[in-house]
Amino acid sequence: MASARNLLLLSSSRLHGHGYLEHARGQLEDLFKSANVKTVLFVPYALRDHDKYTATVRDALQPWGFNVEGLHTKPDREQALREAQAIFVGGGNTFVLLRSLYEMKLLDPIRELVLQRGLPYVGSSAGTNVATRSIHTTNDMPVAYPPSFEALALVPFNINPHYLDPEAGSRHKGETRDERLEEFVAYHGLPVLGLREGTSVRVQGEKAILLGDRNAKLFKADGGTEELAPLADLTFLLQK
């Protein structure tokens, strides 16, 4: 059965020179309007202050015509998800977010609603990490201990949000981002998409495309790498 996926996976909510979510406004509007979304259910669990975080997202989306409600305010979270028009899983600490989703038993309902019923899903940073098969390629400190690194698996590959290129001439002797991602590939034999700031992945059913004005870097399962230009067809990454 074909997937009903309707996803927008952002590298980040903030981009230098832009207001909160401003760089992704057109992408968000396209996604929400395609599904006639008027109210977005925000999942704030990647940060500690859920009320403040939800208010930040509300302040960004309301002027564009979208209401925002916080999942944390709902007495029955699973029912709220089932009644939602769209969900937005915000960034922050990926380990904290995933542990919260496990503790609240929300992984299975989200997975079902997104993959089988086509519930629009927006992820940013940590929210993008948990949308992938696992959180192994997050940049975050493991300040919390989820039961597993396995995540929602809305897409069958890994993403590294906030991807940074190695700095030419750097005197830093620690591992580069590339070396860490290459290590993951060596152990797991799975591809990782490095999303630079301002880029995102749009998934509609069995098709995916790279959005934004910068390249993404693909770390291939065989150990090679490839630069992918804006509007590149990423559908091949959806093949399990």
From Swiss-Prot:
Signal peptide (from-to): none
Q: What is its EC number?
A: 3.4.13.21
Chief location category: cytoplasm
Q: Does the keyword Cytoplasm apply?
A: yes
What CDD domains does UniProt report for this protein, alphabetically? GAT1_Peptidase_E (cd03146)
Active-site residues?
125 (charge relay system), 140 (charge relay system), 162 (charge relay system)
Q: What start-end ranges are recorded for coiled-coil regions in this protein?
A: none
- Enumerate the subcellular locations listed in this protein's record, separating them with semicolons: Cytoplasm
Listed GO MF terms: dipeptidase activity; serine hydrolase activity; serine-type peptidase activity
**One of the Pfam families matching this protein, by short name:** Peptidase_S51
**Which terms are listed as keywords in the entry?**
Cytoplasm, Dipeptidase, Hydrolase, Protease, Serine protease
Q: What does this protein do?
A: Hydrolyzes dipeptides containing N-terminal aspartate residues.
Q: Which family does it belong to?
A: Belongs to the peptidase S51 family.
- Name listed for the protein in its UniProt record: Probable alpha-aspartyl dipeptidase
